[in-house]
Amino acid sequence: MFKANVLLMGGDMTSKVMVPIVREPEIGYTATFLGKQVKISEEGLPDLRKQIRQHCYLPYVCSKAEVEKLSRDQEYVEKVFEDLEVEMVKDWLSLIPKKAPGVKVIIHPGNDDKFVLDDVLKNSPDIVFAEESVVHFDDLHEAACVGWSNPTPWNSPRECTEEQLLEKLEKTVSQLKSVETSCFCFHVPPYNSTIDMAPKLDATLRPVYEGGRPAFIPVGSKSVRKVIEKYQPLLGLHGHIHESPGLVKIGKTQCINPGSEYSEGILRAYIIELEDGKAKRLQRLEG
């Protein structure tokens, strides 16, 4: 449709929600999905799994005993999540030759993506794994890719101090041939940039309301902003804060965050056309 030469995915590939589908000897299967109790037969299982995945949730077919173990064994929960995430990413990667033939697919993880996924991505012949490295869009335009974030309330796998993040950013940017014609593909957006606004949380991680409305605060990275202001790349390509889509200029650099509504089955992205060291087109896409 768009005749793209490159497809870039900048992290947060996997779901944070698992949906147990419980085997019931006399019923078939039961599950709680989208707030509703669902009962299905064996024949309906593939369709339910498909529906769950379309919302980017992780379907987990299991017994009642396994559900009970999930409720009391956090290590088991983590192991199941890892296995399901690996399975989902492998399934997605298998679609690339059919869905995007001839397209250069570049993927780097985000702060929420577990390290176990790195080997899955590195072993795929159909993508370029780009974490903490530089990749080429074409002969002129490069991308410096870093998926780590500054600290979050969620203790995610790839977060670090601002000082550590700055070191990672500088090390990666130093590999670029020409910053002026390059993109900074940093998962976390720059601090206080309007594309980093997230709900303010209290000590129990519940949203704070002010004047009867949820309060929002900037949660992006000061190190990312510092590096963008220092080097002024062509584009800043960001994500991380799903509820804060937009486009903003920091100096000469246009920074974008497409946002995300994956749980609603909505794709958000940007169509970017690069030519002669300039961004000729930045078109938001959702559907």
Language-model segments: what does each one mean?
Residues 7, 12, 110, 143, ...:
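Divalent metal-coordination and catalytic microenvironments
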Residues 1-138:
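Core catalytic region of metal-dependent phosphoesterases/phosphodiesterases
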Residues 134-140, 156, 160-161, 227-230, ...:
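Binuclear metal-dependent phosphoesterase catalytic core
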Residues 139-183, 202, 214-222:
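Binuclear metal-dependent hydrolase catalytic cores centered on His/Asp/Glu-rich metal-binding motifs
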Residues 70-86, 183-232:
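Active-site-proximal segments of metal-dependent phosphoesterases and phosphodiesterases across multiple
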